[in-house]
Amino acid sequence: MLLKLETLEQVYPLVKDDPVRPKLPADWRIQNGREVYVLYDDQYAEQDPVLFDGPRAVICVAFTDGIALTEKDLENTTNPNTAMFYTVWSYDKGAGRQIVNEVASHIKKTREEIGRFVTLSPLTEMAERFHIRNGAVFLRKGTLCQNFEYEREKIQ
């Protein structure tokens, strides 16, 4: 089950676990064109028991005008046309991939002004492997971050 977090009380306890951008304040993540989503096991599953208690994964998204290459660029939210996935972490194997796919699908269905789905990823081999394996294509590398794009047409 995908849940959009609306309050500081919901976001604050999770920020301490952010391995990519732990210094970004919790309140900043849910203001001015930025959102936080959490993936949980479906608590109402009839066939399978709930296997994971608590959040399985978290993703933070900024809706920006163009592609961000720095954290500062994530504040350019006045005329958004791009969903920037700027941090994702998981507590359960496979949940990172699942939350990226589910949030991209949700945004595609609910925000028609968003035409691109791009990451603001750290310059690590792990980030590169994660996004390439999930179907993203490499866009560019900056001095502090790199971008990968999930093509809109391929998002379910």
Question: How does the language model describe each region?
Answer:
Residues T143-Q156:
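C-terminal "cap" of GNAT-fold acetyltransferases
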Residues M1-L3, T110, K154-Q156:
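Short, Lys/Arg-enriched, disordered terminal segments
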Residues L51-P55, I59-A83:
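Conserved acyl-donor/pantetheine-binding loop and adjacent beta-alpha core of acyl/acetyltransferases
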Residues D27-F63:
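Conserved beta-hairpin
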Residues Y44, G66, T124-E125:
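Short, solvent-exposed loop/turn segments at secondary-structure junctions
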Residues E71-G135, T143:
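Acyl-donor binding region in acyl/amide transferases
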Residues M1-Q31, V38:
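Short amphipathic alpha-helix that is part of the acyltransferase structural core
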